[in-house]
Amino acid sequence: MSEHTTTPQGREIAVRVEHFVRDVVVPFERDPRWTSHGPSPEMVDELRSLARAAGAMTPHIPAGRDHLSHRDTAIILRAAGLSPLGPVAVNVAAPDEGNMFLLGKVASLEQKARFLAPLLAGRIRSAFLITEPAEDNGAGSDPSMLRTAAEPDGDHWVINGRKCFSTGLLGAKVGIVMAKTAGGATMFLVDLPNPAIRVERVPETIDSTLPGGHPTSRIENLRVPSSAVLGEVGEGFKYAQVRLSPARLTHCMRWLGACIRAQEIASEYAVKRQAFGKLLIDHEGVGFKLAENRIAIQQCTLMIDWCAGVLDSGASGTTESSMAKVAVSEALFRVADNCVQVMGGAGVTRDTIVEQVFREVRAFRIYAGPTEVHLW
């Protein structure tokens, strides 16, 4: 991304975020409060307090301003991603980043004041309840299989169903629930926690960056007023695309930053570690892997910039974001794998964040739609 496609404001914010992540967030990577289900609530609060003090909170949506361009957002989220904890710290992590974008586009003024404002301030977290358990033959990559249903009852709706992989549900204060209604699907805004939404389990997954984990929950007779409808009744699938196309790309932005950091760590290791009488970097097998990574990182950067330009033009970017998600997720997995391989035994330990980036990027090939679904 060059000065021809980004603004001075975007570049200045990206530099500020990068300094904050490298200087302040990186030392937290060894904090024991970072669990298998993400950083603890206390750790999130501490990181966000530091982000506010540094002027790095929700940096892609400056106070009193609209969302920056997708191209400016790309360099900012890439900077945030230089630590796996960076996006959480500066409030650009999934699912909150995508939910804020959706609410900014679709929510009523009252809903924005009640739900969006505290999200933008980083005071609360959110969850997006759309995916359903496979054992129920529910909606996964195919949203048309949606089983959770909402029935009208006077000026209220009653919702029943099960959800899974609702990232961040534990500890979230607002949820966006997708449910079947007559004539289509509808999104509902729900205050959390709610006794009608019961967490059944929080599975252990290979990723561990996002607070609140990826719970499975049962929704039983959840009663919400008609004012809880997000947008229009029956337009849920349309709104999902409003959210998902940009969200696919912001995943790419964040994990590009993480893989840049992994490449830095692996390169530093290769120029210090010796084997067979010379530095690792002087062995072609190692040098080639790091060179291939440099090429892949540049290709990902250009792919993201191209797709961001499509979104900035006002196009939906459905096809383009699928293309970018496939290309970037597959390339970054190879980058992370090469970094582990270059570092050998050190690469599979938790002495650095390289092994974590590898695990997170592996999950990225599934999250926001598996590669095979986007290709199809």
Label for each model-derived stretch:
Residues M1-P84, A93, V106-Q111, P118, ...:
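Alpha-helical interface subdomain recognition
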Residues V90-E110, E135-D136, G140-D142:
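N-terminal glycine-rich flavin-associated loop
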Residues K105-A107, E151, V177-K180, L189-D191, ...:
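Short beta-strand-to-turn element immediately C-terminal to the catalytic PLP-Schiff-base lysine
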Residues G122-P133:
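A short, Trp-centered hydrophobic/proline-enriched beta-strand micro-motif
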Residues S141, M145, P193-P225:
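Flexible, small-/acidic-enriched active-site or ligand-binding loops
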Residues N160-E200:
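A short core secondary-structure module
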